[in-house]
Amino acid sequence: LEDPENRAHYLRFEKKPGFDAAALGVYTLENGHIRRITGAANGISEYLCVYDCQNSSTVDILDPRITDAFLALTHEKYFERFGAEFGKGIAGFFTDEPQYFRYETAYTPVLLTEYKKAYRADVLDLLGALFVDCEEAPGFRFRYWRLMNVLYTENFMGRVYRWCLSHSCRLTGHTVEESELYTQMWCCAGVMPFYEYESIPGVDWLGRKIGTELAPRQVSSAAQQLGKKQVLTETFACAGWDVTPKELKRIAEWQYVNGVNLMCQHLYPYSIRGQRKRDYPAFYSEHNPWTDELKTFDDYFTELGYLLANSREQADVLIVHPIHSAYLMFDRANDEASVRSVGEPFNVLIERFGAAGIGHHYGDERLMEKYGSVKDGKLTIGQCTSS
């Protein structure tokens, strides 16, 4: 992060009365169509300016050069010192919440070359369509966010996963904000392709709430389709110091019903001195007075998880995941409202399936493109077939 070349990028949009040569791209809107302009012109009273900005809080994980530098500074150092234990005492790595810059409209300079490779067009020609409604907006937004998802999965997660496999260890962990369409757009433009690059696909479940089945069913669907036996949840964070084992059992069983079979309890601190005690409690360590009584709890979920991991869910119903529909309309400034016409009906559908106890999987279109086929009127994704 000390090197500005490594920092995350995002886009800022402004309407200005004059042309700004400092902008990444400047546009005008004419009869519902957006057009890129390269200088001041007569008859234009409003210039739509898009700026390339950076944030020093995180790195640009969409850039493979930066991912390789990260691996060299972390994983390679571990291997130099502890390589003999890789695949033995050191089983693997856990990655926590990798994301592009989530607080604005995400961007990476890598798009300047990758967009041309993918679409034979200049990404700057229509970049303003991310911010204004125009005839070109749906098509451009789809292409933009689909490529952002590809860069996220291939240039970060795929590279880390391949490094782990080549060094005899496994990779697990989770992405971030998995439980809504619009929050997935904040961070990665779709979580399901991420799970292809985990030895044990994982999800994060915070607090005491029981939501829709989307988050655990996304990860379990991908795991079943890709033949990955175990599905991890990092769970119980933000449940509070006054949470009871009975409540924890309810939270965990709901996730296990929806496809999870391995638990990572958040968290086990060395100390809770000072502010540490407020780090998303409760903690499942000797600092919690009833932790010693959790053996029965842990044994139950260990045995249940073993049974589920060595079984296969019979889910004949496949729901095509609508994240690609969200690409067409997502506008970071309008956030949830911009994809509400897709998100709300999807949530209603999920709730109805859950209430009726209908087992189902989600089909991500990128995974379907790679692993899907149709035979005898049945759709197959990897190892799962739907009638």
Segments and roles (model prediction):
Residues 1-96:
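Mature N-terminal, pre-catalytic/accessory segment of carbohydrate-active enzymes
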Residues 1, 10-12, 80-92, 99-387:
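Carbohydrate-binding surfaces of carbohydrate-active enzymes
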